[in-house]
């Protein structure tokens, strides 16, 4: 995928924040839009300080808009609303949607009849970080 020079990322969780940093390191101008009060809230306490320091080092390339909600995506960027209700238009060559995950429980449960040892693990139960999902997979395997 060709990423333009001016990027808007909708969703300031760990994935969106890391994407913003990576693109900034590639010289892109990035605007990170997060509806919550802070970015990378789902990062662990060891990783987050280093991530935030890196973001600070790339402050010229990354603009962070917290308490801002994306209300529409168009060919040339997004429309969003800030905490005061002010509508903003953010121009971009590329829009990346990193606004969270929803577990696909129904798809996972459709596999239950295949085995008497069926276990749901990882993101099909609830979205989370890879270390938790791998540990849960290991625990399920040890039960079999």
Task: Annotate each language-model stretch with its function.
Residues 16, 44, 48, 133:
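Short, conserved glycine- and acidic-residue-centered signature motifs
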Residues 1-5, 25-110:
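A Rossmann-like FAD-binding core segment of flavoenzymes
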Residues 1-26, 112-129:
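Glycine-rich dinucleotide-binding loop and its adjacent helix/turn
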Residues 18, 34, 136:
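Acidic-residue sensor for enzyme active/binding pockets
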Residues 132-144:
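An active-site-proximal "capping" alpha-helix that borders the catalytic cofactor pocket
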Residues 28, 48, 125-128, 135:
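Basic side chains
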